[in-house]
Amino acid sequence: MRLKIFFIVCLSFLSLVCSASDVVWYNGKSPVNYSVCEQHDKVVDVALDLFSSDMQAVTGRYANKKSNSVIEIYQLDRLSNKEFGQLSKYSIPINKFITQPDAFYLANTGRKVVVVGSNGRGTAYGILELSRLAGVSPWIWWGDVRPTSKEYLIMKDGYKSLQIPSVRYRGLSIGGEDWTLRPWSKTLDHRLPAGAIGPRTYKKLFELMLRLRANLLWPADDLGTTPFNRVKGNLEVADSCAIIVGSKDPLLRDDKVEWGSRNGEYNNADNHRWLQHYWEEGLKTAGTGEKMFTVGLGNFAILGARNEHDKRQLLQKTVHEQLKLIKKTEDKLNKKNKNAPADYPTLIIANDEVRSLLGNGLQLPDATTVLWPDDGYGYLLPAQGHLSANRKGAEGVLVHLSYQGTPHDCLWLSTPQPGLLVSQLDAALARKANRVWIAEIHEPKVAAYALSLFFDKAWNTSSVTSDHLERHLTSWLSAQFGQTLGQRLLPVMREYYRLTAIRKPEFMGWNQLTSDKDNPKVNDTEFSTDDFGNELERYLSDFRALKNRVDELSQEVPAPLHAAFFAAVAFPVKAAEAMARKQLCAQESREISRPGTFHHDEEALEAAAASLDAYDDLCSLSRQYDALGGGKWAGLMNMSPRNLSVFASPSLPDNLSQKERRQYGVGMELNSQLDAENATAATAAQYDHFSGMITTVPLLGHSQRAVRMAAGSSVDYNFHLSGSGDALLYLAFVPVRPQSNGSMRVSVCFDGGKPIDIDLACPQGTDEWKKAVLRGQLLKKIPLAVDGYRSNHTLRLTAIDDGVMFDQWMIDFVDDRTFYMIPTK
């Protein structure tokens, strides 16, 4: 009787919220049902399994396949004539997307919820779009984001959504997995030998990629990792999930592991026969699924050539031979495969040597995509102007969300500023690099928002712009934690991105790596304890306030989302804060202490105890991460990737006794008062006038409001100076690279004087580039003479070239001041 009353109440409620033409696809009584066309790809079944599980999480009951269901699912390229006839009764604009790979249409039509995909992937994306509409986050498994239960699910009258991907190939690259993904994978593939990442791990990764609408994988390929194709089941699970398999190295090989000294030189001139055999054998083991082939000579130097002309000829010959080898091998493998791909997409990575040759007449087939990489830290390298202007073939970009290399690894947290990611992808679009986009990460969980942002942008390039970036972040946070908490978390994440832009946690050791085997000691930071009111403690104070705010908001998180909140918000904020506290308090202790007096100096002991407490906090946070979900993520978050010195226990004047730890470990008092006497500073966005095309980019730069400037645009500032005489003008820029003609220049004019031109090109590998990458700013310094008879002053900065990202400026009358942060509020 009670159950009957409940259903009557539910039906009464539905009648109030639904119009006659709305479609109720879950009514609170029966499980969600669907029908699907008879012939469809395996990936559709994978998506339906995910959808069924999603519905169980939302409604308490798994979705079922059933004829004459309210949800109808069609895969256009596998339909029978009868099924086409059934579909024709609905008003669906099939001609707009039938030839578009991976596209789908979802609509309330004919009192049905109809999902139509152009191919298997498109159909799968359409099915999982229903999960999104039901409130299921793509991070339901990887992020432990449990959806809110629903009493009913309705598709409103008139709802229709046609989605066609902007970028054809949307890829994920795994790199730096030695310390994270690979050891964690043993929790899923525990029977596999050391070094192998197996099909259970990749299945979970591919399911995430389906939810994010990524379709291309460059598998994990670090030196200790077994090549993807050698692990039984990996190719099969990729095929079942319709994931295109590619590789960083040529022709689906893993050169770091598979090319040994026994093979001789990686030299296609003098060792041609063996290289051809090596590549052909690799192709034979690559299976019959979809593939994308990297061509060229990878990261090896082009050997066997005496000069640039010979290098160019040899590389052109190599690519030509590789394309013939690909066609020969693939045609043979797919001879009996009626679903064989119609073409074999290829790309070449424009590393330094290839870029140089592209600028000197290297000819590549138009069918081969040129993939422009970033510098490892999110700043796209310049394209070759001749290639971009004259080549008909497609282009793409590779963006790192984490990185192993010089000047320092980023393999712990993933802290790319959203504004940088979007602005660089917009730069790629401006130069028509929109065929292939690949994001590299050491493991996906730590980069949940960055990956969501990247693949949302790749799916629909106009859906995420600088103007709406904070709205996108708020929407993502709300999708994970609910609208109220999501809105409250926006300022938290804004501040997190600001503080980690000032210095990434991995860079807090203030040292540089010169090779993979290098591990230099930790140095003192450039944060001053004397100037601008102790900027070291001010930075720590800001981090402390942020951590406290996270603790406050954690009390509002529903119990089912505790694990999700910890991993996505609490852990990164608290870990970054603890790293800063560990290093900066240790530095204060070293600076305060004098030889022989350390154990009698309360200030030095307090700072040392605070540093040790921070290290203990890092250990505790890592243990909490390992314990999430009953050990589900054990091994994924390593607190000391590659055992670099920045992650070690703090370097202090001497050891503290347990008694000293208890006595002085009560927390330091922090001086957070800003004192900018004799200096005037502002953010770039605080201009009084502007001309030309400029855009303020949120979540970018130390200011979090960097100004993107087109060639010929200018910004003007009017201000008062209290001093006169000699001064220094500091100009801070986001260290993006030239994108058009290889140059990036600005001119600056103070008080209407003669303009001074400044070169911002900052070539990769130079000391200036290394410092700029580590600082997150390119800092330029210009001497000024300030007229004491003027009370009001002006500053004009003009972009000579496109792409300038202006961040902050300061005029300082103290010529020997030591500081790290420009003191803007």
Pin down the residues of each PLM region.
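C-terminal amphipathic alpha-helical interaction region
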Residues: A604-A676, F690
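Gly/Pro-rich turn-and-neighbor structural signature
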Residues: L153, D222, N229, V237-D239, ...
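Structured mid-domain segments that build the active-site/substrate or prosthetic-cofactor binding neighborhood
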Residues: L210, N215-W218, T225, W372-G378, ...
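Extracytoplasmic
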Residues: V646-K825
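The substrate-binding groove and active-site-proximal loops of carbohydrate-active enzymes
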Residues: V114-G117, D178-G198, N215-T225, W259-W274, ...
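Contiguous, structured surface segment used for ligand recognition
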Residues: S21-I164
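An acidic-aromatic substrate-binding cleft motif
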Residues: W139-A194, R200-A220, G393-G396
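C-terminal non-catalytic alpha-helical accessory regions
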Residues: R146-K150, L473-M637, S713-V715
